[in-house]
Amino acid sequence: MDTDRLHVLTGGPGSGKTTLIEALAAAGVATSPEVGRAVIREQLTAGGDALPWADQQAFADLMLVRDVTAHHDALATGAVTVLDRGVPDVAGFLRVSGLPVPPHIDDAARACRYNPRVFIAPFWAEIFTGDAERKQSPEVAEATFAVMVETYRGYGYELIELPRAPVADRVRFLKARIGAV
């Protein structure tokens, strides 16, 4: 399998990942949206509690299924794809939540591989905002960044930090590094 063409964009909440993914898609780059937001929307609509502020383990399990599916779907396209988070993010989420990473999640993070260089958006206080789906504080967002660095390195990835720059500059930065210029 050619997992080198699967590029992960990770980082804490509110660091500009979704905005960057949307801009990359508009520029013609194949992308895969963050699954966590979809799970949150569905749980809120259904009155479920598999939410990051309620049942974190259930939320992680739902994210895992979708992140594994996103990985397989991106592989099937044959295209260079930028994914808004990857399977290791599920392990990172549990660590930030103070929960152990169960073997099935650790195994999935080891099995679903991506390009060895992972892009990480640093915490950026000037652009951080909360919303109905992002209830984390700036402190938790900053801690999430640090945990994602640790988590991805633990799975053998090299991290490339995105510049704190306008979206167009971030698009150019990322496209130049994935060969999509």
Question: Which residues fall in each region the model found?
Answer:
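Conserved substrate/cofactor phosphate-moiety recognition/catalytic segment
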Residues: 25-68
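P-loop (Walker A) phosphate-binding loop of NTP-binding proteins
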Residues: 12, 24
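Conserved glycine(s) of the Walker
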Residues: 16
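Hydrophobic anchor at the beta1->P-loop junction of P-loop NTPases
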Residues: 9
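Post-Walker A alpha-helix
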Residues: 20-21
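Glycine-rich phosphate-binding loop used to anchor ATP phosphates in small-molecule kinases
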Residues: 60-113, 128
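A glycine- and Lys/Arg-enriched "phosphate-lid" helix/loop adjacent to the NTP-binding pocket
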Residues: 98-165
